Amino acid sequence: MGKKKSNSSNAAQILESSVSPILEINYNDPLFTAASHPTKPILLSGLATGHVYCNSYDAEKLEELTQSKREEYATLEKQAYTQGKIPHINKSVSQSKKKWWTIVQDNTEIPNDGDLINTNWKTKRHKGSCRHAIFEPLENSVGDFIYTCGTDNIIKKASTETGKVVGKVDVSSDYSNKKDLLTKLCHSVTHPFLLSGTEDGHVLVYDSANLNSNKLKFKVESAHDDSINHILAMPAVSAYHYLTLGSTTLAHIDIRKGIITQSDDQEDELLAMCFPSDEVSQSNDTVLVSHGEGLITIWKNSKNKLMDQLSRVKVNKSASIDTIISTMNADNEDMANSVWCGDSEGLLHRINYKRGRVVETRLHSVAKGKHGAVDEVGILDIDFDYRLVSAGMDTLKIWSNTQDEEQNDEDDDDDNDDSDGDDSESVSGEDSWSDISSSDEELDTNPDDDSDKDDVDVEDDLQLRKKRDDISQLISKPKRKTIDINKLTKATKNTQPEDDEEDQEVPEPSQKKQKVKEKKLTTKQLRNMQKHEHGIRKFEGL
């Protein structure tokens, strides 16, 4: 008998978005890092073997081919349903028996001159594993160079076009502990500052324009007590200011002076962080952090100097949220207020942090992988055309930036019903600065939870909800007729003589009882299935 799926996985499949991948690449060796070029359709992948691959793809052709095959598959499904060969038409991407997107079974077999995807170059870049890879973000040379680090304690700079190494530095001489290892890289958007985090919690800074000098530019000792999980630049504040995550704390550092502030102990591992789309290059005030206990927390530098979280969004209690990234799309209000996150159950969630809820779910992995029960999502990126790129240790997927029109219409209807329900509860519920959760039942049962934490951005959303107050009242009016039924129930159970008069009213309310039917589960109620299971899946061997 197979292992029973968690409630969160079942709910995710029911609430699944109709968006499908356009490309899927499978890896025989564990994939440790991947990056998408900021302005071109180029992918970079680093493996546990130390190999680095650079691939390019034709996004337009992949989109067209995927859409064409999907329409063909949908037509065949409708015909089979009409002929009675299948009980229903399957509209789920993950549960479909046929995949209509382009699939590469082995990344090593991608040709050098392929029509849809090709290999630009490949190389054995590091001895041991390649732990992290990033593209250069400097305005005058954006994407022209790549930086990689490995367990060989070497950071290498190479040309994106050719893969040829143009600079490298051995950082082992700058370690306080010779057994220390590199974990993460980060590059300044405006200056040639290349930051590297270590397992002992230090931050080392080098001049990316002159790596061969092997000269350490700055060093921040013990930014954290444990391994650096993430480094995030703060270009709107200063080229010298960065945020770091390690163990259970968030730190604000100045690479020249050291730690500015370090947060309170969150008693939960902090794994990744990002700014919202509208704050990536401006203000850098709001920070969203993913946790090992399946939630996203919201922080504000202007509120408390990033000393503690202000509010939270519960995403998946049975998994760790291993990675998070901004949608990078500020053209649409919903997307601008959203971030993508990936969890250890292979699920992708789009969180609207101002509404405090999960608004879209995709399934990166639904089957057992080579290196675990499922392909845990540990890598997220956004490609040059705002497509989501998700990856685990087995598979990388590029998702379409278009949605199936027929399914989209149905989703819009569901969202309208769902949003009306949210409006009535939010207006009558707790203050905007209380604990934000994707489960409204959680809000109702814990009205005072985190009541001392607040977030100014949520207030605008509440004002919009109040404008639709009348609609929510109209929807809730029929429920008031159930009061007579409650009296009836009380009268039936109570045997005292003074309730005899109520017993005489039985015929009238018994007719109304027919109107009180058990409704079908709404998308909102299905989403609440996610909160009925506990547990954390920790990293192993990464």
From Swiss-Prot:
This is WD repeat-containing protein JIP5. InterPro entries: WD40/YVTN_repeat-like_dom_sf (IPR015943), WD40_repeat_dom_sf (IPR036322). Belongs to the WD repeat WDR55 family. The lineage of its organism: Eukaryota, Fungi, Dikarya, Ascomycota, Saccharomycotina. GO terms for biological process: positive regulation of transcription by RNA polymerase I; ribosomal large subunit biogenesis; rRNA processing. Residues 400-542 are annotated as: Disordered. Residues 462-471, 530-542 have a biased composition (Basic and acidic residues). It comes from the Eukaryota. It is found in: Nucleus, Nucleolus.
